[in-house]
Amino acid sequence: MTHVHTGGDDPGKVAMLGLTFDDVLLLPSASDVIPSDVDTSSRVTRNITLRVPLVSSAMDTVTESRMAIAMARAGGMGVLHRNLSIEAQASQVETVKRSEAGMVTDPVTCSPTNTLAEVDAMCARYRISGLPVVDAVGELVGIITNRDMRFEVDQDRPVSEVMTKAPLITAQEGVSAEAALGLLRRNKVEKLPIVDGNGKLTVLITVKDFVKTEQHPLATKDSDGRLLVGAAVGTGGPQWERAMALADAGADVIIVDTAHAHNRLVLDMVAKLKAEVGDRVDVVGGNVATREAAQALIEAGADAVKVGIGPGSICTTRVVAGVGAPQITAILEAVTVCHKAGVPVIADGGLQYSGDIAKALAAGASTAMVGSLLAGTAESPGELILVNGKQFKSYRGMGSLGAMQGRGQGKSYSKDRYFQDDVLKEEKLVPEGIEGRVPFRGPLSQVVHQLVGGLRAAMGYTGSATITDLQQARFVQITAAGLKESHPHDITLTTEAPNYYSR
């Protein structure tokens, strides 16, 4: 590339030309690849592979337990935001892990002395329809389900008076999934307790889990058949306690989530987490925008590096602080060191269309973290808003005033993401994000279908049978005229497409 003198005596003062998604297109290649036949699986961390290379953002209007469950069932993964109390975030991890399992190895139980009201509250919390009943030593003495409680008026009655009492249909430890399914089918029951030789409950198998497995064949699961889930932590305040609680709750990935990860606090947190819980949880560091920052995270032990400073639609870091790097260039810089170390890159932010996801992966990222494209789905926790007969959902940056002030939830846990946890007066906060709304998009499954469909099309055009192949694709830099030509033009739009909207 020809370097243009920008003034001054230091030719390296302007480091390089920065490119983002609208500045490039993927060049088509000779191909015998059919989009429906491509393999979209890719690593999100050193040790975890997703069927679909999509991760939902750790934002309080994008990912809570409902979104995380839906993302994992679709083949991706959700990262639970940290603008919650430690207990609430850990509880959401538990909700995801308990939502689906081939065998529930630590089933929620109740005692014969619990009241129906207490059982109903537990069922609502964990979104389950019934509980095994165990005595003080853990021996199975009965089971109580919605069917037992449906017509009970007195919610103070003890479980022992309403439950279906032992002997129950059970199986011994070591039973195969096929044999368990046979018992469920023959006895027409929905729950099969697994007991040891002393009659103590060890595992619970439910028919719903078999049904869910059939309904969601791409679901990403751990070795115990539970859905994968990630969770975000910071560096300030009680973040170590938060990380330990999340690990104990069963999180598969912990992301040290900050606006600037090339910082000693972040690097130390990553290293400390790897030393303490690295044998059971993968640790991700972010966000960065330079190869030096990526290298620092690798040396700290990160299992993946998250790239993106300021590309998000709700982020104002680049104009408030004047800092960042266009996302394609940031990814290209990070992968120069990450690929050599075998560490995956997560491209976080700036994705407006499915084609941008393909570009991010072609630049070298292994997965893409998506925020605005998912904020409008039914599963996002954002508020549903009706404006002139059209539905929208609220969407805000974690650096917005609302997020840092805790508006809508009483207390903020996100200030330290922007290193402002020492700011005691709300009027002294310096926001690096905005609040807004996005169109309601319907169920997540439909949105993910379109996003993955666009990725598959890109893989077909570039002759890429796998994501690794796609990373070898080449770009062409385009002009403003080329971008204008890329979008629909010289026509009045009469019917909207599910995967395109004009800006």
Could you describe each region identified by the protein language model?
Residues 36, 85-94, 152-156, 200-220, ...:
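Active-site-adjacent beta->alpha loops and helix N-cap segments on the catalytic face
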Residues 79-83, 109-110, 130-132, 170-172, ...:
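Catalytic beta/alpha-barrel core
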Residues 82-97, 133, 137-153, 184, ...:
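Terminal amphipathic helices with adjacent charged low-complexity linkers/tails
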